[in-house]
Each structure stands twice: as C-alpha cells, then as structure tokens.
Amino acid sequence: MSHAPPLGALLRQYAAGSALTCDPVEQGLLNRGYRLRTTRGRYFLKHHFDPETADPLAIARQHRATQRLADLGVPVAPPLTGTDGRTVAVIGGHAYALHPWIDGRHRHGGQLTTQQCARLGALLGVVHASLERVMPTQGRTPARPSDVTGATDGSAGAGGSARADAGGSAAAEGVDPARGADAADTFALIDRLLAQVRRHRPYDAFDELARHRLLERRALLERHADRRPPQGGSVGWVHGDFHPFNLLYRDGEPAAIVDWDRLGVHPRAEEAVRAAVIFFVRPVGALDLAKVRAYARAYRRTASAGPAELAAAVHRVWWERLNDFWMLRWHYERGDTRADPQFPAASALAVWWTREYDTVCEAFAG
C-alpha cells in the first residue's frame, strides 16, 4: 500500500486497538483517507497531506468547530481525542486524525426530491447560523480563496477529503478576492489556452470542445465585461467546500457533513449559491430551477439571509464561472485529466446561466 500510514503509533496514540484491515478509500485530491477496522471498531483515518491545510493548529481549530457543531445537533463526525488530549497526531512530520466511520452514500441533486432539496438548503443555513455561534467573531476578514479546486472524487468515510467543481478557483492570475476576476486577465488566459489547444497532439474531441468553449466564452466576456461585481458583501464562517461529495446520506437524510479543511471566513451566501450550482446542475449544463427554489428558500429562512444578499451572491458566482477555466488549466498546463468528465456540463453552464441570468436570480432570491 503506497503512502502507508504508521498504524502502530497512531493506534497507540488513540488507544484504538490493533489494526485488522486498512484500505485506502478513493483518493481525494488534497488528502489521503483510509477505511480502518481495528479490534475496537471502524474508523476513517485521514492523512492531512495538502500543504495549504495541513497545519496542525488549523486542523485542531476545525476539529474544535465540528465538536461544537455536534453539540448543537449539526450532523458532523468529530475526530477522536488521543491519549494526550489532542485530536491531531503528528508523526514523522505528517498530520493525521482519526474519525468514526460513518456509513452512507453521496447524493447529487438529481437524486433528491424537492422536499429533500429544501432540507438541504435548510441544513446549510443551520451550518452557517451555528458557525456564527461557535466560532470567534474578532478578526473576521475574508480569507484569500485557494487557487486550487478539485476533481470529483469521493470517500464514504467521515472526515474524508473529496472535492468537486466548487467554481471558486481564481481563473485568471491577479484575481482580487474582494471583487473577482478582471476580464482583461481572463482574455489573456483565454489566448494562452487557445494556443495550447492548437499545439496539442493528437488533436481530439476534447480539444475541439475546449476550443469551441474558449471562443464562445471570449465572446460572452466581450459583451459582459462591464458587469464585474462590486466589493463583496457581508462575510461569516463557512464550511468552505460544501458539495455532494462532502455530504453523506443515510436512509434519505443527511448523516454527516465531512471535510472541513476549508473552514474559513467568506461571504456566506456565495457558498450557498456555489453549493446549489454543483448539486443541481444537469448534464446538459442547465440548473434544475425548481429544486434551486426549494433549496434557496429554506436556506434564506434558516440562515436569516435576505433576497438582496442572495441576488448579489448569484451575480458574483456567475461572474466567477464566466471567468473560470480551472479544468482546462489542469488539462493543458498540468497534464491532469481527472476533471475532464466535468468539463462539458460545467462549460455549458456558464453559457446557459448568462442567457437565463434573470431567471436564475429569481430562483435564488424570489
């Protein structure tokens, strides 16, 4: 097993018995996870591998947050505490955490009823409202968004690290996190990507679609370049990566929200919009607006968020999507094709959303 964790030392630190089996779960982009069965039970062992989120102090902070959320009844899976009183084990310079194993499955919005979509929106609203209660209020300034988004892969264990197209990547260099991408930077990025597409050999169907979408997006940006959003609105503590692969369902109900590595201070309503866009996008690149409406109304109610806050968030996330090419950058600049299956729907969504802008705003804020 590659990257095998130091099970002996870890299990001693958590007094979790002796290992019987240890199997890697489907490997996430940012961290590594293992389904661990010992003489004392079943666990999810998480190796915090991503340098951006592997600081033990930051991990301990998100652990404390999930413990407090659990006390409020939010479905989370807080880590176990070691014999030293800590939840983070640092062994050989690597940070680990041990969580209870949560049986469950991931569900996309297409697998949810309208009523379940409303419960999903209410759940995220409860998360945001609860974080306001359990996290410090001093020094609440928006964190700089990561320039990395992830490929869609998931794990069924508590605390798993799975990432999907959160649409939050900085599509162009020099992004002002308070205002979003500058169209001039995006035009330069489009030109660079087009040159890479032309040079790619053998030229295939993905290259043809990429070229088509890049030219299409450039035309859209030329028409809408003056719609860059103003300074962002009110901020609060958010999960930071709320999407189908970080939510486990059991018997039709949410069992656990996992992967809190991106816990931070950001505009709350933008997380609600990004999550809905991921949950409710159809393969053709359109949103299921009936489900969006049910979700958004429930979110606004439980998060005490007004229509104007949601409408502003819709505009900012739309602009973010219009300027976002992280999947193509992975494909052509990194040679990483894991996100390729997402590209057809994600790239079509920006076009559809621009055409149906008012209808989408109404679904979230009406």
Where are these regions (language model features)?
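Active-site acidic catalytic loop and adjacent metal/ATP-binding pocket
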Residues: 29-37, 44-45, 79, 224-270
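Protein kinase glycine-rich loop
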Residues: 23-27
